From Swiss-Prot:
Name of the gene encoding the protein in the UniProt record: recR
Family per record: Belongs to the RecR family.
Record's protein name: Recombination protein RecR
PANTHER family assigned: RECOMBINATION PROTEIN RECR (PTHR30446:SF0)
Function in brief: May play a role in DNA repair. It seems to be involved in an RecBC-independent recombinational process of DNA repair. It may act with RecF and RecO.
Species of origin: Deinococcus radiodurans (strain ATCC 13939 / DSM 20539 / JCM 16871 / CCUG 27074 / LMG 4051 / NBRC 15346 / NCIMB 9279 / VKM B-1422 / R1)
Amino acid sequence: MKYPPSLVSLIRELSRLPGIGPKSAQRLAFHLFEQPREDIERLASALLEAKRDLHVCPICFNITDAEKCDVCADPSRDQRTICVVEEPGDVIALERSGEYRGLYHVLHGVLSPMNGVGPDKLHIKPLLPRVGQGMEVILATGTTVEGDATALYLQRLLEPLGAAISRIAYGVPVGGSLEYTDEVTLGRALTGRQTVSKPQPPQRPGDEDGADGAAVPASR
């Protein structure tokens, strides 16, 4: 028996979502089919509204519906500390911990040469002008192979800019994502972060070359 074309199309589109395979997409499609029409219309409206109103913050690249995100627009935040994360969901997770009052920078991914993701595919270059002498940059990428490789690449790139660089570590499970780590563990991870590079005299003239020329650690 063949599925109707409209159902096949729905399953195909749902399977494009992260973490959703063909079988999960099929279950979701049947679930949606069984829901009242008004529920489906409300879901469709919410999707269209989010796509219309949401964009990335021009400073930190977090998701926002305003000119700047709430963190960048808050003058009470610590302007001398920047926490670098992989995805917008990581910002929400760290904010829930209540242990961090600095700024953020969202990369929207990690380095993954095997998947064709190099530095030019991430929001790395816009980070460089935000970092200066006497600041601290917390590298809070995940503890996956790609997350560690991205942190090492950023460390090498940021060291000449004169900032102290630390790596989130304590309590975050190996191979884990910050988005799925509980707030207590994340709070301890921030408090127990380890310095990986002390401040050095800034070398601003090499910014452009560094962004393109620093070696990308190979992911295993």
